[in-house]
């Protein structure tokens, strides 16, 4: 029986699942929006939101905790300098999951996961207006 077991297995071993979720978290913090399957997005949200909560206040101990989960100095710096202060007044709900149809190959439900208060890049719109 599956009582009191949290999280999704996603048909992977535990080490593969942890590596995949860490890589997806790094991609989300780098690009601030990624497209993935709905179940992966829901599982990624469980990983990302506590990391953003830790990055609100910049201390050495919190940097070490975040670095132990992310393992990339550039992303940790971006979290504490840019994203953490941006979410300082927000108590939770840092990510948004938007459903975007089904994948053409196997009809898996797809979704965008994005950071809520991200700065949208308007350079493409400026070029199109000219």
Swiss-Prot record:
InterPro entries (UniProt xref): Ribosomal_bL17, Ribosomal_bL17_CS, Ribosomal_bL17_sf
Coiled coil (residue ranges): none
Record Gene3D superfamilies: Ribosomal protein L17
Highest taxon listed in the record's lineage: Bacteria
GO-annotated biological processes: translation
Homology family: Belongs to the bacterial ribosomal protein bL17 family.
HAMAP family per record: Ribosomal_bL17 (MF_01368)
Protein name per its UniProtKB record: Large ribosomal subunit protein bL17
Species this chain originates from: Buchnera aphidicola subsp. Acyrthosiphon pisum (strain APS) (Acyrthosiphon pisum symbiotic bacterium)
